[in-house]
C-alpha cells in the first residue's frame, strides 16, 4: 500500500524479528519530515505518542491508530482527539485497535461527546489477525484502503 508509518516515539525501540521496529523500511523517523505536518508544530507534538499514523504520497494520512492493550481506551481516544484539534480538518480514519472483548468499551467511550467528532473505527484483534493471515497466505497485492475498511467497524451511534 506504500504507506510510510509513524510509530510512537516511545515504541521505536521494541524488537521484532531481532530488529528494532524503528529501523524497518518505511518507518517515519521524524514527523517534522512529513509534508502534511511541516507547518503544524502543535500537531507534531500531539502526534509523538500516537501508536501509529499512516502517511501516503506526502499528501495523504489514511489512518491515525491507537492500539489499546495495557492502557485504557480513553487515553488513546484522548491522544487522537488532541492531535485532531491541532491539525486543520483533514480526511483520515481514527482507529482504535483493541481486544475483541473490549468492543463495548470502545463503542461507549468513542460515543462520549468529547470524542464523537473522531468518528472512530474499531479494529478488533481478531480482524487484525484474520487480515494478517490472509495477506501472508495469499500474498495479497494491490490492497486498497476500502478493503481495509471492511475490517474496521464504524462505532459512532446516530441519534
Residue ranges, per PLM feature:
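Solvent-exposed, non-transmembrane amphipathic alpha-helical segments
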Residues: 18, 25, 32, 84-85, ...
Amino acid at each position: 500500500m506504500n504507506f510510510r508509518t509513524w510509530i510512537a516515539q516511545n515504541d521505536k525501540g521494541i524488537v521484532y524479528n531481532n530488529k528494532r521496529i524503528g529501523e524497518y523500511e518505511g518507518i517515519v523517523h521524524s514527523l517534522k519530515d512529513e509534508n502534511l505536518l511541516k507547518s503544524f508544530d502543535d500537531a507534531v507534538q500531539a502526534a509523538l505518542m500516537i501508536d501509529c499514523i499512516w502517511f501516503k504520497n506526502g499528501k495523504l494520512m489514511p489512518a491515525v491508530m491507537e492500539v489499546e492493550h495495557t492502557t485504557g481506551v480513553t487515553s488513546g481516544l484522548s491522544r487522537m482527539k488532541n492531535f485532531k484539534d491541532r491539525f486543520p480538518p483533514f480526511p483520515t480514519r481514527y482507529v482504535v485497535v483493541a481486544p475483541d472483548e473490549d468492543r463495548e468499551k470502545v463503542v461507549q467511550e468513542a460515543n462520549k461527546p468529547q470524542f464523537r467528532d473522531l468518528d472512530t473505527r474499531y479494529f478488533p484483534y481478531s480482524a487484525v489477525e484474520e487480515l494478517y493471515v490472509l495477506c501472508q497466505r495469499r500474498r495479497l497485492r494491490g490492497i486498497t484502503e476500502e478493503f481495509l475498511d471492511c475490517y474496521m467497524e464504524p462505532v459512532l451511534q446516530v441519534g
